[in-house]
Amino acid sequence: IYEPGLQELVTKNYKANRLSFAKSLKDAIIKSDIVFICVGTPTKKNNYSADLSQIYKVIQEIIKNIKKFKVIVMKSTVPVTTGDEIEKIILQKKSKKLFSVISNPEFLREGEALRDFMFPDRIVIGTNNTKANNTMKNLYDPIIKKGTKYLNTSRRGAELIKYASNAFLATKISYINEIANLCEKTNVNIEDVSIGIGLDQRIGSRFLRPGPAYGGSCFPKDTKALLSTAKKFNTNLSIIKSTVKSNDRRHKFLSNKIKKLLKNKIKNKRITFLGVTFKPNTDDIRESSSLKLIPLLHK
């Protein structure tokens, strides 16, 4: 995936011997004090739950190569209680004195990842292990000294913070899109409404730009995974359900709007899509609104 500035930064630090690459996973684990797990957790094809198969595959490799104390950091977005399950698996083979499983969710935006890493809104560490917490504090010390807030919470708390954050942002997008629909019907300028809402400091202006449905590698899968978790724990997240349904309807709504503008004479028309990625400054087309809209126009 393309990320502005990343290639140059990797090259610079590799040449300065601040960055190295291991030839095998075994070597990387043995030589490290902290092991970050940063693999994909896509939505399963048959339901809304997160596919954790890549997580468990990596865990088996880590278990084989734990020789001294390791802080095992879950960066991947995983459902609440995943850390508990991982700890149980490792404890079957290794002593608790040799490891600590913690949650450290990432909040990077594609296209803005370098800035978000260097100047994050917050650093969230989920652990009740003092040694592991101190290790992570030392790691992030240069960033903390810049004034970044550091939150030490429970492992489950950190896991849920990530999902709840993404679901809230997705809800803001679906909300402003529905308000935009009402603005069209009432002949009101949605841009003015958006600005007026955003000037309220309790709300803020970000994620209040009306447009296509949300997409990408996070919001679609994370809202669905959160609903799956809620179902597992017999909890009704009606707002998140509505967010997902509203977002799914958005594609059909835009398709119908385009057809209406063309007076339903869409056959043999040439329609240009300016960008098929889900957002600017990335080449990621996962859950892209454009790629969902194009087939609807062909129907």
Describe the residue ranges of each PLM region:
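Structural/interface elements that position substrates and couple domains in central-metabolism enzymes
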Residues: 1-299
